[in-house]
């Protein structure tokens, strides 16, 4: 594969939206000795371009976490019709990864740093029997959950806070301050849907918050416990990290000046 030589006058920047099933991967990011979504995608894109292609993602999902709408950018001197980046790449990708859209954007765009908001959805099944058809694609608890108590706790997390109690010990962010703009919880019979929106997320932040909400939903702690965790800023006091199975990166928001499509997907509940 021919490595690219950087000259901004000959390079074009392409933005791609893609979906993937994270069950077979060690996460988004390339890592030695394991199969990642990023490595699969870059290999397929390089096949289309005939040159080495590298991508930058809006968010780095963990092992087992899925995406309904991940956003990446790439830079290349190879000219291809936008549809070729979609269909040509999909022809070289495994069935659990698919390019949805392709757009050309100005050189100063960055998939990660230009993003103003990210949205995650978590689908959680609450019933005695574990899921079969949706195994690995939906979270599960065998006990009932109190929707109202979880909603009360969720409201305490909205706003700008220090989320140290909900960050992984491996988190590399220099600050735990984040702006959580939305945390909606809805119930559809036995299925609970959690929607998290923030300017950015800490490592394991969504799954750690979810673990706390589930503790509150089953009656182990009152809703006010969430406020205490925020104040204490101590990860060891919070609930364990919840399963990745039902977690989906579902959208990334960018300023209108980039003239990009709306990268936000809400998957109907009957085709999770």
Curated annotation (Swiss-Prot):
Keyword Metal-binding listed? The answer is no
Q: What is its EC number?
A: 5.4.99.12
Task: Fetch the SUPFAM superfamilies from UniProt.
Answer: Pseudouridine synthase (SSF55120)
Q: Name one GO molecular function term.
A: tRNA pseudouridine(38-40) synthase activity
Question: What does UniProt list as catalytic?
Answer: 62
According to its UniProt entry, one GO biological process term is: tRNA pseudouridine synthesis
**Residues noted as binding substrate in the record, renumbered to the chain:** 120
Domain of life the protein comes from: Bacteria
What catalytic activity does the UniProt entry give for this protein? uridine(38/39/40) in tRNA = pseudouridine(38/39/40) in tRNA
EC top class, as a word: isomerase
Q: Which UniProt keywords apply?
A: Isomerase, tRNA processing
- What Pfam families does UniProt report for this protein, alphabetically? PseudoU_synth_1
Q: How does it assemble?
A: Homodimer.
Physiological role: Formation of pseudouridine at positions 38, 39 and 40 in the anticodon stem and loop of transfer RNAs.
Q: Which family does it belong to?
A: Belongs to the tRNA pseudouridine synthase TruA family.
What is this protein identified as?
tRNA pseudouridine synthase A
Originating species: Nitrosomonas europaea (strain ATCC 19718 / CIP 103999 / KCTC 2705 / NBRC 14298)
Query: Gene encoding this chain?
Result: truA
């Amino acid at each position: 594969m021919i490595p690219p030589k950087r000259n901004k006058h000959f390079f074009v920047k392409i933005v791609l939206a893609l979906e993937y099933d994270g069950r077979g991967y060690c996460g988004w990011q390339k890592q030695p000795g394991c199969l990642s979504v990023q490595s699969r995608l870059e290999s397929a894109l390089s096949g289309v371009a005939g040159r080495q292609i590298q991508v930058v993602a809006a968010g780095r999902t963990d092992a087992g976490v899925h995406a309904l709408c991940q956003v990446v950018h790439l830079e290349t001197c190879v000219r291809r019709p936008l549809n070729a980046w979609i269909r040509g790449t999909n022809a070289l990708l495994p069935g659990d990864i698919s390019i949805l859209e392709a757009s050309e954007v100005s050189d100063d765009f960055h998939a990660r740093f230009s993003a103003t908001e990210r949205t995650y959805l978590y689908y959680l099944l609450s019933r005695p029997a574990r899921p079969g058809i949706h195994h690995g694609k939906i979270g599960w608890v065998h006990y009932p959950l109190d929707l109202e108590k979880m909603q009360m706790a969720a409201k305490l997390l909205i706003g700008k806070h220090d989320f140290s109690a909900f960050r992984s010990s491996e988190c590399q962010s220099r600050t735990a301050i984040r702006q959580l703009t939305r945390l909606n919880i809805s119930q559809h019979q036995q299925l609970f849907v959690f929607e998290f929106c923030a300017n950015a997320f800490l490592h394991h932040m969504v799954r750690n918050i979810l673990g706390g909400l589930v503790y509150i939903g089953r009656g182990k702690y009152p809703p006010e416990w969430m406020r205490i965790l925020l104040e204490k800023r101590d990860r060891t006091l919070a609930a364990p990290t919840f399963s990745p199975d039902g977690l989906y990166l579902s959208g990334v928001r960018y300023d209108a000046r980039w003239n990009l499509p709306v990268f936000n997907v809400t998957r109907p509940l009957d085709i999770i």
